[in-house]
């Protein structure tokens, strides 16, 4: 049986996105495992992952918990630039209810997670996700 590298890269991207989204819904520290060491923002601004991790902690600290998390992945795409480098994205829609004491708020919308292939592993280099802002 012949190996299909396209399928493997697509599956890796989807699996990484699912781990990120599920970690988001649980407000889990494991979310950092999917992040690159650097992030590329619009205007080619580059920031370290520690800035993103601090931002995620701040966002997660605004709610006691997230409940009812749901998502649909609509598109996955990537482009390889040699054997060890590439860029890709996973996009779709996501929603959840942010609960704080006796109040709750529904947060939903489109998402797009941007990835870079580094050392054989896809890592997130930019986040567009409901409830997240830089």
Feature locations, PLM:
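A broad structural signal for short, well-ordered beta-strand segments within beta-sheet-rich domains
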Residues: 9-13, 66-70, 124
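Surface-exposed, charged secondary-structure patches
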Residues: 54-102
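A short gly/proline-enriched turn/hairpin at secondary-structure junctions
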Residues: 34-51, 65
């Amino acid at each position: 049986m012949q190996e299909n590298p396209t399928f493997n890269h697509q599956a890796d991207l989807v699996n990484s996105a699912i781990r990120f989204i599920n970690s988001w819904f649980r407000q889990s520290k494991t979310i950092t495992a999917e992040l690159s060491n650097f992030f590329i923002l619009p205007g080619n601004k580059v920031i370290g992952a520690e800035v993103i991790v601090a931002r995620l902690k701040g966002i997660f600290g605004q709610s006691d918990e997230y409940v009812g998390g749901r998502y649909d992945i609509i598109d996955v795409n990537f482009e390889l630039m040699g054997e060890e480098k590439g860029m890709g994205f996973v996009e779709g829609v996501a929603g959840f209810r942010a609960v704080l004491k006796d109040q709750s708020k529904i947060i939903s919308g489109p998402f797009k997670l941007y990835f870079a292939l580094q050392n054989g592993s896809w890592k997130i280099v930019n986040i567009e996700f409901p409830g997240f802002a830089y």
